[in-house]
A protein has these predicted regions:
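A membrane-periplasm/extracellular boundary helix in multi-pass inner-membrane enzymes
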Residues: 4-15, 19, 23-88, 214-229
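Transmembrane alpha-helices of multi-pass inner-membrane enzymes
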Residues: 18-26, 57, 167-215
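Alpha-solenoid helical repeat scaffolds
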Residues: 237-238, 268-272, 301-305, 335-339, ...
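Register position in tetratricopeptide repeats
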Residues: 245, 279, 312-313, 346-347
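Single-residue signature of alpha-solenoid repeat helices
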Residues: 252, 286, 319, 354-355
Length: 404
């Protein structure tokens, strides 16, 4: 009852659905078949009417959950669509991980121009697919996903045969929740899933003690030390981030350099390191770390800073390519259009027609979140346009980088 009191306050529709389905399944499995058979024959019409009423209520509840947070629901639908496209491109798995494959699929989709306006509005740069099954299929391959599902349903079958309905219900709840969230990216849920699989019956088949011994060997064989090192590195990262955000980039660079061996697979860390190097004027080094960050994050800001590095090195074609990829990654963002407008106003790369197109996008596109940064970008683009015919352009020491 305590859990039922807390559940509504979470505003998690996935959790509500998972709890409802698992509870209904457990209640159904504990039914008295003989009594239900007698009642069905006696009150068949009444049960049919009740069933129709329950179906109507559930339909209204589903519609209500959608309209509770419509953009969130549409956003997940779009993420699943992009993940499926990425799976089609990488049916045997993507060795570079989810973020890289997802970002590539989304860029190609928006670059085609064949998409709905709501898709542009809800698109983002997610770290997870919000569907564990699709993410496993993309990261490790469709065959591995099928194998994992086979093992899970095998455990459920054993659990049902052993009449462990409560444990099976808990596992079903986790499976339903995994359909529209990312529980298996959190250690607590991973441990819970392993314990539930063992309790369902697979532990009786292969031996609980054997499984526990294997887990302990893996833990003490490296994972414990690795997680401890990463935890300590993340603590030091917080201190380095203070330097980064306060503008002490040289000091931040030294701190990031020490942390790099432990955090070299974290996209957010690599972006901060690369951006800090960019701010320090070390454009080649910045490009190197941002190129690594692309493998672990699909944030278009990585592409924007890579393009700015190229522009600072007077490699304008390369800069244009990165800015255009950023536009196709999230066409609703104004910042890459602003960067392209500034690029096309460079004395060695001036293009009035392309500048005009980018100016229109900067001035007329509606941002997701309005801010003073939007005003600054629009004002600067208008100033560049006013000074275009005189042959001069507005040169700023730094671009606006906080937007939307």
């Amino acid at each position: 009852m305590l859990i039922l009191c807390v559940l509504p306050s979470t505003m998690s529709r996935s959790a509500w659905v998972a709890a409802a389905i698992s509870c209904a399944w457990v209640a159904y499995m504990h039914r008295d078949k003989r009594k239900w058979s007698i009642l069905w024959r006696r009150y068949k019409k009444r049960y049919v009417l009740w069933g129709a009423g329950i179906f109507l209520i559930l339909s209204l509840a589903a519609a209500g959950m959608f309209f509770l947070k419509p953009d969130s629901a549409l956003g997940r639908r779009f993420m699943w669509k992009m993940t499926c496209r990425a799976i089609a491109a990488h049916p045997w798995g993507c060795p570079t991980g989810f973020a890289c494959a997802y970002g590539e699929a989304q860029s190609l989709y928006f670059a085609s121009g064949n998409y709905a306006s709501w898709e542009e509005r809800v698109a983002g740069s997610p770290e997870y697919a919000f569907n564990e099954y699709l993410e496993v299929a993309l990261t490790y391959g469709v065959a591995m996903c099928i194998l994992v599902l086979f093992v899970i349903f095998g455990c459920l079958w054993i659990g049902v045969k052993l009449r462990r309905y409560g444990i099976c219900g808990a596992l079903i709840s986790l499976l339903v929740f995994s359909f529209s969230s990312y529980p298996l990216h959190l250690p607590a849920f991973i441990v819970t899933a392993i314990c539930l699989l063992l309790a369902c019956g697979i532990g009786d088949v292969i031996g609980k003690y054997l499984v526990l011994c294997v887990c302990l060997v893996l833990w003490f064989g490296g994972y414990a030390e690795k997680w401890t090192q990463e935890r300590d590195a993340c603590r030091d990262w917080v201190n380095a981030r203070i330097l980064y955000r306060s503008g002490a980039y040289e000091a931040a660079n030294r701190a990031y350099e020490k942390l790099y061996p432990s955090l070299r697979k974290k996209g957010a860390f690599l972006f901060e390191y690369g951006h800090s190097l960019h701010k320090s004027g070390r454009y080649d080094e910045s490009f190197e770390y941002l190129d690594q960050a692309r493998l672990y994050s699909n944030d278009p800001m990585i592409l924007n800073i890579m393009g700015k590095n190229c522009q600072a090195l007077h490699e304008y074609k390369c800069a244009e390519a990165f800015f255009l990829i950023s536009v196709s990654r999230l066409p609703g963002r104004i910042y890459p259009y602003y960067l392209l407008a500034k690029l096309y106003s460079e004395p060695d790369y001036r293009d009035k027609d392309k500048f005009g197109d980018m100016k229109w996008n900067v001035l007329n596109r509606k941002p997701k979140v309005y801010s003073t940064a939007i005003e600054e970008m629009r004002r600067e683009v208008e100033e560049i346009a006013e000074n275009w015919d005189t042959g001069s352009s507005i040169i700023c020491s730094d671009d606006v980088e906080s937007e939307e």
